[in-house]
Amino acid sequence: MKSQSWLVMALICMSFMQICRASSKEDNKIVSLPGQPQVSFQQYAGYITVDEKQQRALFYYFVEAETNPASKPLVLWLNGGPGCSSVGAGAFSEHGPFRPAGGVNLTRNEYSWNKEANILYLESPAGVGFSYSANTSFYDSVNDTITAQDNLVFLQQWFEKFPDYKNRDFFITGESYAGHYVPQLANLIVQSGLKFNLKGIALGNPLLEFSTDMNSEGYYYWSHGLISDSTYQLLTSTCNMSQLWREGIRGSLSPDCEAVNDRISAEIPYEIDEYDVTSDVCVSYGQAQLKVNDHPLRARFRFSKSLQENSSKPVSSPYTQKASENIDLCVQEKTYEYLNFKNVQEALHAQLVGIAKWSSCSQVVNYDRENLEIPTIGVVGSLVSSGIRVLIYSGDQDSVIPFIGSRTLVNNLAKQLGLNATVAYRGWIEDKQVGGWTEVYGDILSFTTIRGGSHLAPFSSPKRSLALFKAFLAGKPLS
């Protein structure tokens, strides 16, 4: 057994040294991804070492803007989880230039965000996607502090590799648990005094304040007809959603919360996609692959007996959507399939270090789930006070982190900061249709909904999300 462990460690170390040798920008240039249509913009992918001693490296995928990349801003994208891949979700399922079409095939995404900016997708923390730590004990205790510090080191090293982007307007964006990752990283940048030209942050359906965000789930369930009046009454009087989450994070439910959990489970079928309550689900790729990609931040624990048992049940995918909107219901499964082809990994300069397969959400990282309870809305406020522009946006069909809680938090923050509404709450129009609702405070803090959008709004509502992204970069209100 000892000799086997030594051999595994030796192989990991050899992989680390091989990866680190390919350290220049040109070494990381992608000639072409298998199955991709012809494009004129450049793509890069590879590793940045964030801890030489522990041999910890983060994987990135970088796509330059379709046109005039030298004049367009740099945008860092972080997916949440905690522990889910920005390459698998952000790049290949949401707003990257390509979408997997089954097998080793890619199609163009006509609403790619690299129409407006140079986009950098980072798999973080180590243990997520292709990112790794040779010292696997790192995976046992990952938290927000470590993640933010590693992300900052990554940026410092990345700018050394891509010096042309050092003085470019810089934005940090993300969704879900990136409501922690993004403001914490932005705050580190501001505090460090590093010469990054940080202009703003954008957060989609973000976790910002545990109780407010979680309790809005219960109201959302009831207001959208997913639970009965009597169950909602039980939620508000016996065990609310934030209490249910807290007990779930700690591994067991009290009798009161057990009863509430059972009622919710009985009334909301598993075939309901909690990331988009109006969505159909992918059936053609089967449930086996979906279990591998299960998103850890789920709206309902359903763990009355054990968390392990809960994870084996069929679940809805955060990447499903209405067939009537011509959205590929099975893009998550196709992404999983595509990124596990060996020739795709070779084209991306990616390696599987200590894992058998790439997965959309980490199977090895033990993230400190109590970090979910750390409020970050105050960090957002300090960024606004520092002159950093902030956009909070919400797909309005998401029950996991509903727009209701986000809107309340932004409104309260504006009051605390003494910011008046410079754009009153109103609908915004995209292509002669209502794209959602928006409100702006002090021309620096904005809240916007994306009508019909899911938890991953750029996937489910790509056209409206691109319109919002374009306005955000320009610093202009939506029309």
Describe the residue ranges of each PLM region.
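Terminal and linker regions of secretory-pathway proteins
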Residues: 1-479
